[in-house]
Amino acid sequence: MRMKQGVSRRRMLALSAAAGSLAICREAAAQAEKRIERLDPALDAIISTSEPIVDLATNLGGTANVEGPLWWSEGGYLLFRGTDLARWKYVPGQGISVFKQNTNAANGITRDPQGRLVACEAATRRVTREERDGSITVLASSFQGRRLNFPNDIVVKSDGAIYFTDPWTGPAAVQPPGENDQIFAGVYRISPDLGTLTLLVNDFLVPNGIAFSPDERVLYINDTARRHIRAFDVAPNGTLARQTDRVFADLSGPEPGAPDGMKVDSAGNVFCGGAGGIYILDPKGKKLGRIVHGYQNTSNIAFAGDDWKTVYFCTRTSLGTFKVKIAGVPVPAVKKS
């Protein structure tokens, strides 16, 4: 009996050691998939190739992509859309909790110059603003008598003008457009006084991520279907100088992943998902590096932290982070002089 007990203990120890070794091997394999690729020496001023890429939450399940991250600087937490379409909150060092259950499947969110939350609501096909008392103000729901398609991502200029993408996807793509639906995918501007909705461009296949250069003179918009980012100079009246339309960067490749949400740092470098990970591009569109996080897609990105040098990224079912050396453009945007 003693011998059997002794063998049992040894076997348990051996199995425990084997399980531990297997876990370590799996973790090492997963970490081996994560790397920072230097495509140009200029990357070193932005991020170290030895910078850890950290998973904060994985295998979140659900039917929707993890999306729409936004750092709430006053509270020191990250808001983002969870896989159940609710708005979740991540507090560094504490974890994830549900922040708001019913958001009408809001995707891209940001803040206006007064600090109020502005959202693209997919389920209701509108752009809204949440007031201080929690009430909702509808900022845009139709254009020229036809409903918006599927407001997706959004950015607010420092003068209060709101720019958003409206791809022909989601609920609007389930069936052919009716007489009250748009017949194109558009990019729009809501005037600072909220009185005018202007169609800026309508020749994208799937307009998605949208971001300004730090001086707000250039607007970047990516086209997920074409796998590239386009850039436009911003005219004095806030519309786009169409003659300046150019392909800023092609992010296609053999690996999974396409341009989706994107953000810009204070030096003008663009962070955007693409084939194989997150690309870092200089202000001229040159590829400086790629963050390979080991997931098939990057749905969105946000700068965060007290110094805006923490980057959070969302994938299909995960949330991750890494640090950079150059601060991102703060949200809300600061009025340009």
Predicted regions mapped to residue ranges:
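Short loop/turn segments immediately following beta-strands, especially the blade-tip
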Residues: F232-L240, V324-V329
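Beta-rich, blade/repeat-based domains predominating
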Residues: N59-Y77, N102-E121, R126, Q144-I162, ...
